C-alpha cells in the first residue's frame, strides 16, 4: 500500500515516507543509535550477538501478560522491538501469559496485583492476541513495501505459556527444575528486594514469577531455537534468571537478553496502566483521535526521542525533520509525523483518517468536518460525555436546548453562563439565549449536536 499523502509536511514527508521502505541491517544492535536498547545481557556479549544477527535468521521473543483487556503505549515499544526484528529478517515471537498472568509479575510494582480469574484472563488473552496481530498487519500493509525488499517479513508467532504448563505436574516440575535455581540470586533481584523491604512484603506467588518466566525461555529455546529475549528494563532480573537456568540446563547453548527503555512522561512517570495514566491501544478505550492527540501534544524536548523509538524513519531523516521543525516549531511538523505514524501503526489507515477528520472538525473550526463524524466516532472522541435524545421542535432556542439537554441545574445558571460566553454548540460559542436553532449550524446533517459548557463538559444530543 502506498503511504497516505498529507500536504502539511510536503515535500519533506515524501522523502521520509520513501525512506521507511529501506530494509534495516540484520544487526539489531544498530538500533542502539536510536536509543532503542537500554542494555544487553550478558553485558560483554555485543560482539557475539552481532555475529549471530548477521549470520542468519534468529528468533526473538517478548512476553505480554493479560492483566488487562488491552495493551498500552508502554507495551507498544516492545511491539516496535519485535517489528524491528521482523524488518531485519529475524523471526518475532510474542508470548501471551495465560499461565503467568494468573501469578502476576512483581517487576516495577510497589504492591501485589489483584488476582484475576481464569475467565477474565481468557477474555484478555483473546483481545491482546487480536491487537498484536492487527499492529503487525498494519505495519505490513501501511509501513512496509514488500516489492522493494530482498527478504519477506517472517510471520509473527504467538504462543500461550498455558499450553505447556497445562500438563506439568507440580512435584515433577519442582524436582526437575527447582534444583537449578539459586535462592541467593533470586533474592538479589531488585524487584524482590524492593518488595521485601516494603511494609506489605512479597507473597510466595509473586516470588515464583521469575521461575516461570525463566522456564518459558527454556521452552522457547527448545521448541523454536529462541536465543533472544526482549523486554523493558524492569525485566532485567527476570532475564538474568532465565539466562542462569538455561546455562545450567542447556550448557552448550547461548542465550541473550535485550532490554528497552521504559517510556515515561516528561515528569518521569511511567506510561503504564498501573500508573493511572494509560494510553490504550484498544480504540474503544483510547480512541484513534485521542492516541493521535497524545503524540501530537508531545513537547519539543521529547519529540526527537519518540520519533526514534516509535517510528521507522531512518536517523538521517529524523535529523532532517528536526532541522525543519526547529525553523518553524509552530507548525509542529515533527509531532504531526509522530502522531500520524503511531496512529497508522496501531489503528491502520482508517483509524488515521478518522483521527485527522476529528482533529480538523474540533480544532480548525470545521463544522462540516464535525458533521461528517458518525455517532460512534463522536462517542469515542468524547468519552464520558452525557448522551441525550431530543425531539426536534420548530423554534427551539439556545436556552431551551441547554435546559432540555440538562447542561445546567437552573435556568438562572444557564442564562448567566451563556451570556458570559461559556456555552458552545458544535465548537462555536453562542451567547444569544434567544437564538433559534437551525439545521446545518446547530443541528448537523448527521442528526447530532455537540454541546460544551466551559472547557471539558460535553453533551452529545441525538435528534429524533
Swiss-Prot record:
EC number from the UniProt entry: 6.1.1.1
Recorded catalytic activity of this chain's protein: tRNA(Tyr) + L-tyrosine + ATP = L-tyrosyl-tRNA(Tyr) + AMP + diphosphate + H(+)
UniProt motif 'KMSKS' region: location: 270-274
Subcellular location: Mitochondrion matrix
Ranges in a coiled coil: none
Subunit organization: Homodimer.
UniProt function note: Catalyzes the attachment of tyrosine to tRNA(Tyr) in a two-step reaction: tyrosine is first activated by ATP to form Tyr-AMP and then transferred to the acceptor end of tRNA(Tyr).
PANTHER family linked to this entry: TYROSINE--TRNA LIGASE, MITOCHONDRIAL (PTHR11766:SF0), TYROSYL-TRNA SYNTHETASE (PTHR11766)
Protein name, UniProt field: Tyrosine--tRNA ligase, mitochondrial
Source lineage: Eukaryota, Metazoa, Ecdysozoa, Arthropoda, Hexapoda
Gene: TyrRS-m
